[in-house]
Amino acid sequence: MNDSVLVAPSLSTAQTEDTFEFQSYGETEHSRSYLGSDVTKDNLVELVSAYYSVPELIQYFEEHPQYKKITLQFPDELVLDSSIVVQLMQQELVKAEDETSQSFNTIDTDEVLHNEKSCGNCSGCDCSSKIDKTETKRKVWILADTSYSSCCVDEVASEHVKGDIVVHFGDACMNAVQKLPVVYSLGRPVLDLDLVVSQFKLKYAAKDQKICLMADAPHSMHMKSIYDILHDKEGYKNVVYSDINQDMLQSDTHIVGYNNAVEHDERLRKCVTCGNRNIYAEVDVSELNEYDLFHVTIPKDPHLLYLTTKFQSVTLYDPSSGMLNEGPFPSMMKRYKFMHMARTAGTIGILVNTLSLRNTKETMNKLTKLLKENGKKHYLFVVGKPNVAKLANFEPIDIWCILGCGQGGIVLDQYNEFYKPIITPYELLMALSDEVTWTGQWITDFKSIINQIENEVNDSDDMEQDILSSGTECRSDEDEAPEFNAVTGKYVSTSRPLRQIARLEIETPVEEVRASDSTELVKQFSQTVAIRNTVSTSAAFLQTRHWTGLGSDYKDDEDGEEDGATVEEGTAGVARSYQFDELNKKT
């Protein structure tokens, strides 16, 4: 007989304190393909320092000692390098401060005593003129939660810590911000030029084709080298290339680790400006739509759509895989459809996903004024990163208009995930015009939109002045032209709700009007929905819902009982320990 002690089987999994701790990752190594293939633990710090031009960045802050609170903004794909960059900056900045303080302590005492504004602290007094050395110390913060539209400077996040300056790392759109000075560290990624040239030659066999070379901001440093190989060695005489448009930078904006190669080549000249890029070539570039675009890296969908409207064709080169991508790309046909849907939309939701960009508030004010003049309702939403769940909470909105960066801050909704269409201010401007126009352009610059809105308002004012000066009578009781949805073909009666309120005449018995203290929230007068005798599109939408809120089924009770339900005590406690659980444990 076996003398071993029988142990009952475990009926549940053993749970200790370690069970509820966060999962610890076993792998500490991360992929840093932008640093090259020879990355080791020994040379990682050196490569990161060279990639972000940390020595030049430190030199900039030594030359500008007024910036005490420094905020660093990293995108998600580069945030793994943030700790190394901060450590390098703090070491050098502290060393520079120590040298400055030592040089200050060596000042001759007689020079301090002769200063009438200072006692020189010769007797150990604690007067207000004593210099507080703690104020000279610099602090560095890493800004988090910038995964959406990371190409833009997050000025609002920097103001949370009262930052003096923002250092933006990685790809950037170069859009101007409201207040703070900005330093860009684009990075110096490693790129296999021979592989790029070989893929280029496979795509473009004819050497007389008109081709433009372009890349994101970090990889733009390689465009001049690729141009020299293709133009001088391979014989592509009609090839041109792009570089960063430094003319759009503000006076308090600086780029570290960037050199414009055009300054050292007298053959090249700037021909055309394409957004935040300048096109350089030896020959004249008349129209970009005659050129094919060869773009290194995969741009975001909004910027990619912009490029498809500027060039004859677009071919993308992925540096991570070394392969070409020729589509499918975002199409303007869906934008044309959404523009027509906006023409008959009665309620517009304006999405503001950033408050840092310059001219955002002015564009917002111009749009709201234009919507009111066209008789449409609008609501403002500052939601940060839009998603399906957020926007689905506002069902009365007919269409959304998003205010964001044209490079990565606009939602295109390629897979129809959102319940309502999302358009841009330029598309909304075309939808509000009297004539149906479609230019096929993709304009996202706030300055251009503001100018077009002002021109639209001025044209309407001039038309009204011409009517008044000609003496033509405008009949206010004349019926407006019916509007139909261009997508569904149905008649739309609520496309201009604010304009209809002034002309609406509701006939109802006086007794019903006096009985406005009814328990019903929404009442329907002669096929017109009103709240407290006031027309409302929200009330009209509420009527279409099966469930209209608590107490909505009170009047439809079949039993005719006027007594409410009996109030009973509900469940109390927190999720892990409700009250009835505690009672069960005691019993």
UniProtKB/Swiss-Prot annotation:
Its main location: cytoplasm. Pfam families: Diphthamide_syn. Required for the first step of diphthamide biosynthesis, a post-translational modification of histidine which occurs in elongation factor 2. DPH1 and DPH2 transfer a 3-amino-3-carboxypropyl (ACP) group from S-adenosyl-L-methionine (SAM) to a histidine residue, the reaction is assisted by a reduction system comprising DPH3 and a NADH-dependent reductase, predominantly CBR1. Facilitates the reduction of the catalytic iron-sulfur cluster found in the DPH1 subunit. One of its GO terms (biological process) is protein histidyl modification to diphthamide. Keywords: Cytoplasm, Iron, Iron-sulfur, Metal-binding. Belongs to the DPH1/DPH2 family. DPH2 subfamily. Component of the 2-(3-amino-3-carboxypropyl)histidine synthase complex composed of DPH1, DPH2, DPH3 and a NADH-dependent reductase, predominantly CBR1. It is found in: Cytoplasm. Residues 555-566 have a biased composition (Acidic residues). Pathway: Protein modification; peptidyl-diphthamide biosynthesis. The gene is DPH2. GO terms for molecular function: 2-(3-amino-3-carboxypropyl)histidine synthase activity; 4 iron, 4 sulfur cluster binding; metal ion binding. [4Fe-4S] cluster binds at C152, C173, C405. It comes from Kluyveromyces lactis (strain ATCC 8585 / CBS 2359 / DSM 70799 / NBRC 1267 / NRRL Y-1140 / WM37). Gene3D superfamilies: Diphthamide synthesis DPH1/DPH2 domain 1 (3.40.50.11840), Diphthamide synthesis DPH1/DPH2 domain 3 (3.40.50.11860). This is 2-(3-amino-3-carboxypropyl)histidine synthase subunit 2. GO terms for cellular component: 2-(3-amino-3-carboxypropyl)histidine synthase complex; cytoplasm. Its cofactor is [4Fe-4S] cluster.
